[in-house]
């Protein structure tokens, strides 16, 4: 049973919280000016909190029959002014922080996508499409939303707490010390809950990716699901994942929910102690009615920001967990570039010299001591039973993987001496698994043209003509500018295959790799595609993987692979005459067609 993979490697050591926060801060540093302005704005909001109890204090002590009685109109004017400044400051801080977070979001998302594009092939074997889409599109957005919310609460409410504490010390320092004693107790409780919450968040995220992969499999394979009556099985799979997610969510709710009631209890305890001390002070004329009322009001105003700060723990841990995933992708090593030897256009002399390859920790090597040569312009067919190493061998040519033994030479030079981009410019690839993009016909044919360069439309038309697609394209609503839909869904199977061939023709690379390019087509489509392939192969070194042996009988040479080794090679006639593995495969295939 396949399961979703996380974009971070679980075997790696978990980053420390401080390390993750430092990395997030590194993205915020270029926005230091806006950040400082936002803090100033939030400072004004916090200062406004401390003004209110001071006004109440003076009003009670001086306003009612006291020296302040004739100036009571100042109070509403002051409150209106405070509200106006507070509102403007809140808007300014929100706008500035949104500008910062959206800038960081753009930078992170671009870095993630760039790293994903340049990751080695093994990375895509290790991670599912669902987990990568989740990371690039959703997780990075969640990180910025959560961390921005956390940042606003942390700065604004911390400043509010500071402003109110200053007022409290100014009003009655003895009572304030009681509050100060209880604050570390709140911090201690938060630190205890913190570690468990972070672990639960990390496990919840990994499970979310697995659930997304189940959905991806069900959607991508809907035909198989329906034909085989797999709805109940898929439902049970998804239900199991959903139940586990619910369990983790409840455990997180329990762990996170402890913060608020404990904080509220400690705050109530503090208030009870303060009331007791205040009553003792009142008996000794150490406080006034206004002073005590202002102090209690400031205390009550202090509870809300303290509660907000206590509740920060759960979203902060969720944001840090998602940030770890994002940084795991950003830190993913790119493909090894190796040498920088330039390569304009190769002759196409391709040599496999004692090549071996093993996938990771696999028990058996996929290739063993493979030696063969494809001369410039030669068509070499690779045949053999499933699992014999045909696809692995051709995947080594564009360096999707590097051999674990031996060397591959192009025009006499090991391919890892060439600049990777230059090497891949020499290779065109047409597979049975056609990949087309949700774009126009022209953009698909000229795929890989730099965005700043203009597509050569005349060259596109020539490529389409060589692929026998001119009439098809003329029949489309907007011709070359017609959008072909997701993976070319607006075209038939044969048309999609020929469009992939047109893309290879447009590229005009000296080396061509054909991987079962006609295996999934009907007879008429195969005839058209085969004709297009024949025009494509002219003058190019071609490696052809084929199960249907009738399609490669005219190859210059046929190489038969068995269990990762070259079993035999020669022309079709020579191999039939040897009466070996190829002749046996040929007999079986043609007997089944008779």
Curated annotation (Swiss-Prot):
It is an enzyme of class 7 (translocase). Pfam families: ABC_membrane, ABC_tran. GO terms for molecular function: ABC-type oligopeptide transporter activity; ATP binding; ATP hydrolysis activity; ATPase-coupled lipid transmembrane transporter activity. SUPFAM superfamilies: ABC transporter transmembrane region, P-loop containing nucleoside triphosphate hydrolases. GO terms for cellular component: plasma membrane. Its EC number is 7.5.2.6. The keyword Cell inner membrane applies. It catalyses: ATP + H2O + lipid A-core oligosaccharideSide 1 = ADP + phosphate + lipid A-core oligosaccharideSide 2. It is found in: Cell inner membrane. Keywords: ATP-binding, Cell inner membrane, Cell membrane, Lipid transport, Membrane, Nucleotide-binding, Translocase, Transmembrane, Transmembrane helix, Transport. The chain crosses the membrane at residues 35-55, 64-84, 135-155, 161-181, 262-282, 289-309. ATP binds at residues 384-391. It is a multi-pass membrane protein. InterPro entries: AAA+_ATPase (IPR003593), ABC1_TM_dom (IPR011527), ABC1_TM_sf (IPR036640), ABC_transporter-like_ATP-bd (IPR003439), ABC_transporter-like_CS (IPR017871), ABC_transpr_lipidA (IPR011917), P-loop_NTPase (IPR027417), Type_1_exporter (IPR039421). Residues 350-588 form the ABC transporter domain. The keyword Transport applies. In MsbA the ATP-binding domain (NBD) and the transmembrane domain (TMD) are fused. Belongs to the ABC transporter superfamily. Lipid exporter (TC 3.A.1.106) family. Involved in lipopolysaccharide (LPS) biosynthesis. Translocates lipid A-core from the inner to the outer leaflet of the inner membrane. Transmembrane domains (TMD) form a pore in the inner membrane and the ATP-binding domain (NBD) is responsible for energy generation. PANTHER family: ATP-BINDING CASSETTE SUB-FAMILY B MEMBER 10, MITOCHONDRIAL, ATP-DEPENDENT PERMEASE MDL1, MITOCHONDRIAL. Homodimer. This is ATP-dependent lipid A-core flippase. It comes from Cupriavidus metallidurans (strain ATCC 43123 / DSM 2839 / NBRC 102507 / CH34). The gene is msbA.
């Amino acid at each position: 049973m396949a399961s979703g993979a996380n974009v971070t490697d679980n075997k790696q050591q978990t980053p420390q919280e401080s390390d993750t926060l430092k990395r997030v801060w590194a993205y915020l540093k270029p926005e230091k000016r806006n950040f400082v302005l936002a803090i100033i704005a939030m400072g004004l909001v916090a200062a406004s909190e401390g003004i209110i109890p001071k006004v109440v204090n003076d009003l009670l002590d001086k306003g009612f029959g006291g020296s302040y009685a004739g100036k009571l109109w100042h109070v509403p004017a002051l409150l209106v002014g405070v509200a106006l400044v507070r509102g403007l400051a809140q808007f300014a801080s929100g706008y500035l922080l949104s500008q910062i977070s959206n800038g960081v979001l753009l930078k992170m998302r671009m870095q993630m996508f760039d790293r994903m594009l340049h990751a080695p092939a093994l990375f895509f074997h290790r991670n599912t499409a669902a987990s990568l889409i989740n990371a690039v599109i959703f997780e990075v957005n969640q990180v910025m939303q959560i961390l921005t919310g956390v940042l606003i609460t942390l700065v604004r409410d911390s400043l509010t707490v500071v402003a109110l504490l200053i007022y409290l010390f100014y009003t009655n320092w003895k009572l304030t010390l009681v509050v100060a004693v209880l604050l570390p107790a709140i911090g201690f409780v938060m630190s205890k809950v913190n570690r468990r919450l972070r672990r639960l968040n990390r496990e919840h995220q990994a499970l979310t990716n697995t659930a997304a992969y189940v959905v991806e499999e069900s959607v991508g394979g809907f035909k198989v699901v329906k034909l085989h009556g797999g709805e109940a099985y898929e439902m049970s799979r998804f239900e199991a994942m959903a139940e586990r997610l619910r369990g983790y969510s409840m455990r997180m709710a329990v762990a996170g929910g402890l913060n608020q009631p404990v904080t509220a209890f400690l705050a109530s305890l503090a208030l009870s102690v303060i009331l007791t001390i205040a009553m003792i002070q009142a008996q000794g004329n150490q406080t006034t009615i206004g002073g005590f009322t202002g102090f209690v009001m400031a205390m009550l105003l202090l509870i809300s920001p303290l509660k907000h700060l206590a509740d920060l723990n759960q979203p902060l841990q969720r944001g840090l967990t998602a940030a770890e995933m994002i940084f795991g992708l950003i830190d993913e090593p790119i493909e090894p570039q190796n040498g920088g030897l330039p390569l304009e256009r190769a002759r196409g002399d391709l040599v496999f010299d004692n090549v071996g390859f093993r996938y990771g920790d696999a028990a058996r090597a996929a290739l063993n001591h493979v030696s063969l040569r494809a001369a410039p312009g030669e068509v070499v067919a690779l045949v053999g039973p499933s699992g014999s190493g045909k696809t692995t061998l051709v995947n080594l040519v564009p360096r999707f993987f590097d051999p674990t033994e031996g060397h591959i030479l192009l025009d006499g030079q090991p391919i890892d001496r060439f600049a990777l981009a230059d090497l891949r410019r020499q290779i065109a690839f047409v597979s049975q698994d056609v990949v087309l993009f949700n774009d126009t016909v022209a953009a698909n044919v000229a795929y890989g043209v730099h965005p700043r360069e203009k597509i050569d439309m005349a060259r596109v038309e020539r490529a389409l003509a060589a692929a026998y697609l001119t009439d098809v394209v003329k029949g489309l609503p907007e011709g070359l500018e017609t959008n072909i839909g997701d993976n070319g869904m607006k075209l038939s199977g044969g048309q999609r295959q020929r469009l992939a061939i047109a893309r290879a023709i447009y590229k005009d690379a000296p080396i061509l790799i054909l991987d079962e390019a006609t295996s999934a087509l009907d007879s008429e489509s195969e005839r058209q595609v085969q004709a297009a392939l024949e025009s494509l192969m002219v003058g190019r070194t071609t490696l052809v993987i084929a199960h249907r042996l009738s399609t490669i009988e005219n190859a210059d040479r046929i190489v038969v692979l068995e269990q990762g080794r070259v079993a035999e090679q020669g022309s079709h006639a020579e191999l039939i005459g040897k009466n070996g593995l190829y002749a046996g495969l040929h007999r079986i295939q043609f007997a089944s067609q008779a």
